[in-house]
């Protein structure tokens, strides 16, 4: 038997140098709490999988979502998702609709304010949205990440740095003009995606929902020529790392975002990771559902500062470290993204094979 301790989620504890920076960028520290675990030395090349779903009979008129591998309506098969910028400042809470997201990215929005973060939530079945947000501005990195899903990025403006990204051939975005809700907050915290013909009761103004926004735009609601296929590889059964000698216990994951205090805690009853920030569990304002994930992916990613706290992550890279975390255990991975709109692929650092993940929702953070 041997002891392994996860002292930090990144292998490099010193400094990371961002492309275009004249000074080194400080590496995030202790993004997963250190926890000794006893493991044996048995070499296992593949994760264990249980109860194969390969022979499962599909429910009528349904298919497995390419975002979660869950059964959803077959009419959605070719529908492209949206990627929505959601404000993650304390004043913006509680969020509406985030519990319905299929994939949630959390990345640093500014080098100022103790590394404050913003969500980018990816939603396949966007026609069912009643209220999602509140919505805020985008950064250059978001255009690269949204493009991986052939998603239309929904945001409210951004710094001039995004102009070149908006103009990319593969880029698709809806900026501003979303519904305003009367929530007693400052204007920047009142904008939400909603259903078609939503009318503000105070102002009597009616807003377009996404269906009408698509109809009025040059964008198709279905995948276009820039779609590169499914983003993830899903396992037929449940992925566990119980027999992996290199697996690390990961029951509490403290992300390096001091302002938000972003933390993921493993819930043994549900087998998922519950998201916490500002010291409290994240509950959806509409459904009171806990924001929780079957899969967690962390990427060691450098960034370049653009001035005034703005930044762009060096998301195009190869062979950098990261972790795939599920069922209370983590394994080391490497990741590769070959171009601006290319899919990020994740590989088992031990076997070199592309990882297979569990059915369900996924949290991704660039740290």
Which residue ranges define each predicted feature?
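A surface/extracellular/periplasmic glyco- and lipid-processing/surface-interacting theme
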Residues: 29, 49-105, 112-367
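Repetitive helical segments and hydrophobic/amphipathic motifs
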Residues: 11-13
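Post-signal peptide N-terminal segment of mature Sec-exported envelope proteins
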Residues: 27-49
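C-terminal motif of bacterial Sec signal peptides marking the signal peptidase cleavage site
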Residues: 15-18
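Bacterial signal peptide processing site
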Residues: 20-22
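Flexible, active-site-proximal loop/turn residues at the rims of small-molecule/cofactor binding pockets
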Residues: 25, 110
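Sec-dependent signal peptide recognition
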Residues: 2-9
């Amino acid at each position: 038997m041997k002891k392994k301790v996860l002292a930090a989620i990144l292998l490099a504890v010193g400094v990371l140098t961002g492309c275009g920076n004249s000074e080194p960028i400080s590496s995030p520290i202790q993004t997963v709490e250190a926890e000794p675990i006893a493991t044996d030395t048995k070499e296992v090349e593949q994760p264990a999988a249980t109860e194969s779903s390969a022979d499962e009979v599909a429910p009528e008129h349904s298919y497995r979502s390419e975002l979660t591998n869950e059964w959803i309506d077959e009419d959605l098969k070719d529908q492209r998702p949206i990627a929505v910028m959601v404000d993650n400042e304390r004043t913006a809470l509680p969020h509406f609709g985030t519990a319905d997201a299929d994939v949630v990215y959390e990345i640093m929005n500014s080098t100022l304010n103790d590394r404050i973060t913003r969500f980018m939530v990816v939603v396949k079945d966007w026609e069912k949205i009643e209220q999602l947000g509140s919505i805020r501005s985008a950064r250059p990195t978001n255009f690269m990440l949204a493009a991986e899903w052939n998603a239309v990025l929904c945001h409210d403006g951004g710094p001039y740095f995004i102009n070149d990204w908006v103009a990319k051939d593969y880029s698709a975005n809806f900026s501003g003009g979303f519904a305003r809700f009367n929530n007693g907050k400052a204007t920047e915290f009142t904008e939400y995606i909603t259903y078609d013909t939503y009318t503000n009761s105070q102002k009597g103004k009616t807003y377009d929902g996404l269906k009408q926004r698509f109809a009025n735009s040059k964008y198709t609601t279905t995948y276009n020529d820039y779609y590169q296929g499914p983003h993830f590889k899903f396992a037929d059964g449940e992925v566990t790392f119980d027999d992996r000698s290199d697996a690390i216990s990961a029951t509490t994951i403290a992300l390096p975002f001091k302002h938000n205090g972003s933390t993921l805690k493993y819930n043994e009853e549900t087998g998922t990771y519950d998201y916490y920030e500002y010291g409290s569990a994240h509950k959806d304002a509409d459904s009171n559902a806990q924001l929780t994930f079957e899969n967690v992916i962390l990427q060691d990613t450098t960034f370049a500062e653009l001035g005034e706290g703005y930044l762009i992550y060096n998301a195009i890279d190869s062979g950098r470290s990261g972790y795939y975390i599920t069922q209370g255990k983590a394994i080391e991975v490497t990741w590769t993204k070959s171009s601006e709109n290319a899919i990020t692929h994740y590989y088992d650092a031990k076997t070199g094979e592309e990882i297979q993940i569990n059915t369900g929702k996924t949290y991704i953070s660039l740290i």
